[in-house]
Amino acid sequence: MMSHQQVQINLILMQGIWTSVLKMQNHSTLLQLGSSSTMPQRPRLLS
């Protein structure tokens, strides 16, 4: 039986790079989306 984990997604601007932060119960993952110079607008997260 699978247990449902709570996943929290945050979007931050880190050193000029849009970064998506996935926080789970035991760990967090950083996904670099692209630089703010090529993406001046805040990226939208579609759920």
UniProtKB/Swiss-Prot annotation:
Q: Which residues form the signal peptide?
A: none
User: GO:BP terms for this protein?
Assistant: symbiont-mediated suppression of host gene expression; viral process
Whether Secreted counts among this entry's keywords is no
Report TM segments. Answer: none
Keywords in alphabetical order: Eukaryotic host gene expression shutoff by virus, Eukaryotic host transcription shutoff by virus, Host gene expression shutoff by virus, Host-virus interaction, Inhibition of eukaryotic host transcription initiation by virus
InterPro entries the record matches: Bunya_NSs
The family note in this entry says: Belongs to the orthobunyavirus NS-S protein family.
Report the function annotation for this chain: Inhibits host transcriptional machinery, by producing modifications to the phosphorylation state of the C-terminal domain (CTD) of RNA polymerase II. Inhibits phosphorylation at serine 2 in the heptapeptide repeat (YSPTSPS) of the CTD of RNA polymerase II, suggesting that the elongation step of transcription and/or 3'-end processing is prevented. Inhibition of host transcription machinery leads to shut off of host cell protein synthesis and inhibition of the host innate immune response. NSs also seems to be involved in the nuclear relocalization of host PABP1.
Q: What is the protein name for this chain? A: Non-structural protein NS-S
Origin species: Bunyavirus La Crosse (isolate Aedes triseriatus/United States/L74/1974)
